[in-house]
């Protein structure tokens, strides 16, 4: 996607292959603006026949292998998620929800080795996952972030290990799109209350998120 959302400006030039087969979502400051990339498998500028969306079917497992160690500037957050662009927040999960498989925000404090998982449908459920409690260090190496999705349950994983599960507000929509994004909101009132000013860390930019793959498996 392109344009402005919250306090970030999005360009197609800030998503590219790094020369080693990985996708890099870059974050940078240019002309006093925070610029990055927002990738989605739908577009209101394209016919729906060109969208890539899906539902739980007989059961899905969605996984991405991601490296967030290059995220250095405080304030922006990297995310891997599902989103139904039609009626996500109308309170009816059958019309789709926002399913956050991984949201990671750089912070010098307690959030540095934690990430967020969530499901939003008008109401919300979310959990802050302490990676260390599962033997993981987000500031080192690659990690896989996964979601097992059935019509009645969402189960969240890191490196194949379940970290949370919920049966509330589960989407049964067939129009959930895949999203890979870096977002920024200076606040107040967003960015989970951390409200860091990315321009105070401009010397650490450009930074970004590396993605090895995104895979969607369906139970037969």
Regions found by a protein language model. Give the residues of each.
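GH16 jelly-roll
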Residues: 1-220
